[in-house]
Amino acid sequence: MSSQIKLTKNAYRLEKIKLARLETYLPTLKLKMALLQVEVANAVRESSASIQAYEEARESIYAFAELFSIPLYVDAIANSFKIEKVEKGYENITGVEVPVVKNIVLSESSYSVLDTPIWIDTLVAYSREFVINKVRSEVAREKQRILEEELRNVSIRVNLFEKKLIPETTRMIKKIAIFLSDRSITDVGQVKMAKKKIQQRKEESECA
């Protein structure tokens, strides 16, 4: 890239402008990276909490596992698992759209209270909690994934600015400055030499 840049005053000016823009934008990128690091940590905690709630609900259901061999109870549980609607929205976090669960609507249980034991209500409650937490954990993991991906992308850009773009532009500015300085010295020398020759010719002409 640098070999294609002409060593001129205009190129020097453009490189200085480029460096100023890079150095102005870098702090914004670093701030975004810092904010994303905080948000990723929050998302990890949120995801872990939702997964834990999901697993606890699952363990509560497993405590009744031997009862699932009874068809009547299986039907009662199956009727309580239906998800009618999951309302999802999106929120903007440091310029990134991430999913959030607004509401989860489950169908009303339709099993017969008279034909099932009283503890079936507890099992159905655990089952509904299991379904809700499963959905929330999936959305929380998706939110975490999106934020982690954005953090990786921003980190790459910060590294690109710090390790490549800014150093390369700085070196190019110095290279052009040295070239222009050397050329200026050469030009001054040539002018002096030309004046000296003119003066010599003038003196020789006067002597003749």
From Swiss-Prot:
One of its GO terms (molecular function) is proton-transporting ATP synthase activity, rotational mechanism. Keywords: ATP synthesis, Hydrogen ion transport, Ion transport, Transport. InterPro entries: V_ATPase_D (IPR002699). GO terms for biological process: proton motive force-driven plasma membrane ATP synthesis. Belongs to the V-ATPase D subunit family. HAMAP family: ATP_synth_D_arch. Produces ATP from ADP in the presence of a proton gradient across the membrane. This is V-type ATP synthase subunit D. The gene is atpD.
